[in-house]
């Protein structure tokens, strides 16, 4: 608002009447004391009538002054400049007074030009001189009521009103000093209209008005102060700080409110309450301040979800039972992927427990996640596969390891470079779970193959895309049905608590729900095909497809009908999916055969249980019934297939079946699963993806040669297939010694990387190793070790697992695939540093880590104080490491950056501690030795490596050329004329010089070089050639 030009202060007109007032003062002094109390009420009532009525009747009618011309009016005008302006009525009154009193004031001022200069004037004289000022309602609170005649009041009125545009500074200063010096009498409560609100009107009506110096005025008592501090002190002392905005609807005129309103005054209350609502509890508030206080007191701001909030459920409206159901089903975990329980209590119960998916929390912030973890711990500790809840993290870990449900978890962990650490207690618990007491006989298995459950499991498995998912869900249903149907047998049946997929489950599937095994077959086949093509969907560890490449391990065992699985190594010419060798023959239906293959753990049961099982038609009879026509074919095909095993243990397992003649068998018509006998003729070989997967896992983890520590009890099973050997139902097996087994069991045992009791059912291994024990007729043997590796072992042992070096085969295999693979294994130890893709640090080659650690230690420099400081490896050192190890420059740089980050943040890393103190301690990752200086540490690492770091440059060039020559030799030997001819028919344009594989685009070759040969992008052009050039 533009400020008007200030005029020079005029002399107060009151000084001219000093003598007159002295005379009148003595006369009226008595009257003032008598009418003192009455004048206070009169001056207070003047506020009601002196504003609008004076405009019509003039100032003489009632004899009271207008409020607008007193010092209080100046203050109110100043207040109006800050908040609102004067009313029209007050402006017109001041105009009338200023017109009538201008000449009189000039005349009086000229007649008495002398100013009162005596500072010792008494207080009575000053009160008489300025009675006109003090008669206003501004001073009514002080009780200074003076009764003046109408003429004197008119003169005072004209003298005081020097115009709307002038401000009497001197008079204002005197009134201020008078306010400070006058003793305050009893202050009566001001009337309703004594506050400034009476004079406030809209600024649009009267425009801008400047009234003088800045003042701070109390609304209730109209006291003015120079500073805000004084006004604040006054308000605190008198309690005048109550906000009267809440009374505005009742007390204020209905014209307009002040311009600066609160943000929500223009809104309806309903609209404000819709906006001002706590997102957690749903309470509404009238003002933002109330909402803020509520949020701070209740700490609901920590619990507001970032996504759509949960619909508030009143505790009064929801019964405790429904609230418990709501808590059970609410997915509080940020990683929760489903809002329903997958635990199948019963179809009706699970249907009632479902909640709408829109009640999810979504991803939370940290505070919200902490709160929800405490509130819904059992829901956060939930299996992401089957939805089962657990009270502690250890229980969840045990459940996920036993069921194999943690593939998704390990998938995300492997992407972050983390290794799943298994609790030793949980591992022991799993081991104890997998073993059954010798003297304990299994209770009769509850019927879990009801149509409803079979249907449910079938539909569940169709939704799942992974083998382990199907196992876990089938097992969950089996366990739950046992809990509900046979609660009395729960303490008697030790397998109820087991989370493995047991033979009973597969037995039910083979009778009623064959889709289970069909689904397993399809998923395993898909997984192997994807792994062969380098795009695995099964991501339990960073590079699972390396497990399928058969680079250093054994070959897959003979499957049903002597089927050969064409899994080529990674450097092979063309990677082909699994397909039957004889293309003209159709595949036999697999589900039944797979179910028969899994009947393994039955041999761990007592003979009483065996008799019970024999009393009814069971898949054991099915196995024996259809194994007869296959016996001859396998005995013919087996000799060449035996030599395909590079390791001795599988040789023994496969050679035994052909040397033993099966006992008389039941007719084929005893099959109870409805499969035709023709499906099992030797002319129809079938794929067994589970056997292929088993061989792959055994190859990768070294578990294929695990010995059976004790003989199994005589079993009523007999099958002459190469992977399962079972005798007749009613005749005890005879010990059989295989003539081709050239090594004793003791020599086999040293091929084991580890022995674990935590293995589910065996899908491939033979159970006829009774020849290696003297207790062949024992029926109370402990359970056998099964080789379908528990996924927990895979995660735990994979970084340390090294496949045993294969023994030379005694026979020449007929298939070219095995010849190529054996040739490749001859140089696999040297090629391993190049052809294996490097993963995260958990899967690094230990030799590469030693080299990197030694180089990093050599880069540290020592200061004059004896402290060691970080330095950086130069490009030359990094290039030497890259050439020697085959690691890319990017990988080396990332490793160095990670080590530096850990040292700066925590002061230490795995091989280097106390770096922040300047006196590092070096740790050898191989032997855990400690060293104080980099030189001794480097020399120690060189002793592990077998060479000195300074010789690494020379060795790098030699090794590079040697390895590339070997790779080229092996790869060229692997190429057969048919594959080369088939390759030339395609649109391949580029070729890898190292392995002679061809690709459609140059980009594909570069990806191949990076992934297969670990070549950095800087060297890609050296190893790419056009097919047309040759």
Curated annotation (Swiss-Prot):
Biased composition (Polar residues): 39-49, 66-95, 334-348, 432-459, 773-783, 968-977
One annotated Gene Ontology cellular component of this protein: nucleus
Glycyl lysine isopeptide (Lys-Gly) (interchain with G-Cter in SUMO2) cross-link, renumbered residues: 189, 307, 316, 418, 462, 480, 497, 601, 652, 796, 816, 962
GO biological process assignments: regulation of gene expression
DNA-binding annotation, residue ranges on this chain: 837-907
Region feature Disordered, mapped onto this chain: 1-120, 240-266, 328-348, 432-488, 608-687, 703-726, 759-784, 965-987, 1009-1030
Subcellular localization, as worded in the UniProt entry: Nucleus
Chain intervals with Basic and acidic residues compositional bias: 103-120, 460-482, 608-623, 633-664
Superkingdom, taxonomy of origin: Eukaryota
PTM text: Sumoylated.
Xref: Gene3D superfamilies: Classic Zinc Finger
Recorded GO MF terms: DNA binding; zinc ion binding
Keywords from the UniProt entry: Coiled coil, Developmental protein, DNA-binding, Homeobox, Isopeptide bond, Metal-binding, Nucleus, Phosphoprotein, Repeat, Repressor, Transcription, Transcription regulation, Ubl conjugation, Zinc, Zinc-finger
Coiled coil start-end: 11-42
Acidic residues compositional bias, start-end: 21-37
Keyword set includes tRNA processing: no
Entry similarity comment: Belongs to the teashirt C2H2-type zinc-finger protein family.
Name of the featured protein: Teashirt homolog 2
Organism encoding this protein: Mus musculus
Lineage: Eukaryota, Metazoa, Chordata, Craniata, Vertebrata
């Amino acid at each position: 608002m533009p400020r008007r030009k200030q005029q020079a202060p005029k002399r107060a007109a009151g000084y001219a009447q000093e003598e007159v007032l002295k005379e009148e003062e003595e006369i009226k002094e008595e009257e003032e004391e008598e009418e003192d109390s009455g004048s206070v009420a009169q001056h207070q009532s003047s506020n009601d009538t002196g504003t609008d009525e004076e405009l019509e009747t003039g100032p003489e009618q009632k004899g009271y002054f207008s409020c607008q011309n007193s010092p209080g009016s100046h203050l109110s005008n100043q207040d109006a400049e800050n908040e609102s302006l004067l009313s029209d009525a007050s402006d017109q009154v001041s105009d009338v007074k200023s017109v009538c009193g201008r000449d009189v004031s000039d005349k009086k001022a000229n007649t008495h030009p002398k100013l009162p200069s005596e500072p010792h004037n008494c207080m009575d004289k000053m009160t008489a001189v300025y009675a006109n000022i003090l008669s206003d309602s501004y001073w009514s609170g002080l009780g200074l009521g003076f009764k003046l005649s109408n003429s004197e009041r008119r003169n005072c009125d004209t003298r005081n009103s020097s115009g709307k545009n002038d401000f009497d500074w001197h008079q204002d200063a005197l009134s201020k000093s008078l306010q400070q010096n006058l003793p305050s009498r009893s202050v009566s409560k001001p009337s309703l209209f004594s506050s400034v609100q009476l004079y406030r009107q809209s600024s649009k009506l009267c425009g801008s008005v400047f009234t003088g110096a800045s003042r701070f005025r109390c609304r209730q008592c109209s006291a003015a102060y120079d500073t805000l501090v004084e006004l604040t002190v006054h308000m605190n002392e008198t309690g005048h700080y109550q906000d009267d905005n809440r009374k505005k609807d009742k007390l204020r005129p209905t014209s307009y409110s002040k311009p600066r309103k609160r943000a929500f005054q223009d809104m309806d209350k309903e609209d404000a309450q819709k906006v001002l609502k706590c997102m957690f509890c749903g309470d509404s508030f009238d003002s933002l301040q109330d909402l803020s206080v509520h949020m701070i007191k209740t700490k609901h701001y920590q619990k507001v979800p970032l996504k759509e909030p949960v619909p508030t459920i009143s505790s009064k409206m929801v019964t405790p039972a429904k609230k418990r159901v709501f808590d059970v089903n609410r997915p509080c975990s940020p990683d929760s992927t489903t809002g329903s329980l997958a635990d199948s209590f019963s179809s009706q119960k699970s249907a009632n427990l479902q909640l709408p998916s829109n009640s999810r929390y979504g991803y939370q912030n940290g505070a919200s996640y902490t709160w929800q973890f405490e509130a819904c711990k059992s829901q956060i500790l939930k299996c992401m596969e089957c939805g089962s809840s657990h009270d502690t993290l250890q229980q969840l870990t045990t459940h996920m390891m036993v069921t194999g449900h943690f593939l998704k978890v390990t998938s995300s962990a492997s992407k972050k470079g983390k290794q799943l650490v298994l609790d030793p207690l949980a591992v022991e618990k799993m081991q104890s779970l997998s073993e059954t007491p010798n003297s304990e006989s299994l209770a009769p298995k509850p019927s879990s193959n009801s149509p409803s459950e079979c249907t449910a499991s079938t539909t569940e498995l169709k939704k799942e895309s992974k083998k382990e998912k199907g196992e876990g869900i089938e097992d969950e249903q089996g366990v739950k049905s046992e809990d509900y149907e046979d609660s009395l047998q729960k303490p008697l049946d030790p397998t109820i608590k087991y989370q493995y997929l047991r033979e009973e489950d597969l037995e039910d599937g083979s009778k009623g729900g064959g889709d289970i095994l069909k689904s397993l077959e399809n998923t395993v086949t898909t997984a192997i095909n994807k792994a062969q093509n380098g795009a695995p969907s099964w991501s339990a560890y960073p590079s699972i497809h390396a497990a399928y490449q058969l680079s250093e391990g054994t070959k897959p065992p003979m499957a049903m009908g002597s089927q050969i699985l064409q899994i080529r190594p990674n450097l092979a010419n063309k990677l082909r999916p699994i397909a039957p060798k004889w293309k003209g023959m159709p595949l036999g239906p697999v589900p039944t055969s797979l179910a028969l293959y899994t009947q393994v753990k039955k041999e761990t049961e007592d003979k009483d249980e065996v008799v019970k099982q024999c009393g009814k038609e069971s898949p054991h009879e099915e196995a024996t019934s259809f194994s007869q026509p296959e016996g001859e074919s396998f005995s013919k095909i087996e000799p060449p297939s035996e030599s395909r095993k590079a390791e001795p243990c599988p040789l023994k397992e496969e050679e035994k079946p052909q040397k033993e003649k099966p006992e008389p068998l039941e007719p084929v018509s005893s099959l109870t699963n409805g499969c035709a006998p023709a499906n099992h003729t030797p002319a129809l070989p079938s794929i067994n993806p589970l056997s292929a997967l088993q061989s792959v896992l055994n190859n990768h983890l070294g578990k294929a040669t695990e010995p059976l520590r004790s003989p199994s009890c005589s079993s009523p099973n007999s099958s002459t297939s190469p992977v399962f050997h079972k005798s007749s139902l009613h005749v005890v097996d005879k010990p059989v010694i295989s003539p081709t087994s050239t090594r004793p069991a003791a020599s086999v045992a040293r091929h084991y990387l580890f022995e674990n009791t935590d293995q589910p059912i065996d899908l491939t291994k033979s159970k006829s190793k009774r020849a290696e024990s003297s207790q062949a007729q024992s029926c109370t043997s402990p359970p056998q070790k099964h080789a379908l590796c528990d996924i927990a072992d895979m995660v735990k042992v994979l970084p340390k697992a090294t496949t045993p070096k294969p023994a030379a085969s005694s026979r020449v295999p007929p298939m070219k695939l095995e010849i190529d693979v054996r040739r490749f294994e001859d140089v696999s130890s040297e090629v391993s540093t190049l052809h294996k893709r490097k993963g995260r640090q958990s899967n690094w080659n230990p030799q590469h880590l030693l080299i990197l650690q030694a180089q990093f230690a050599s880069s540290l420099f020592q200061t004059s104080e004896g402290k060691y400081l970080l330095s950086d490896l130069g490009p030359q050192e990094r290039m030497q490491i890259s050439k020697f190890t085959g690691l890319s420059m990017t990988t080396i740089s990332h490793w160095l950056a990670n080590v530096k980050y850990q040292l700066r943040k925590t002061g230490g890393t795995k091989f280097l501690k106390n770096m922040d103190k300047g006196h590092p301690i070096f740790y050898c990752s191989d032997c855990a030795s400690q060293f104080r200086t980099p030189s001794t540490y480097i020399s120690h690492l060189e002793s592990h490596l077998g060479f000195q770091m300074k010789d690494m440059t020379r060795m790098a060039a030699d090794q590079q050329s040697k390895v590339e020559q070997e790779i080229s030799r092996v790869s060229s030997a692997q190429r057969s004329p048919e594959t080369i001819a088939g390759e030339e028919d395609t649109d391949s344009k580029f070729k890898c010089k190292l392995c002679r594989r061809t690709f459609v685009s140059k980009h594909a070759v570069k990806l191949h070089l990076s992934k297969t040969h670990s070549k950095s992008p800087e060297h890609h052009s050296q190893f790419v050639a056009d097919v047309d050039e040759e």
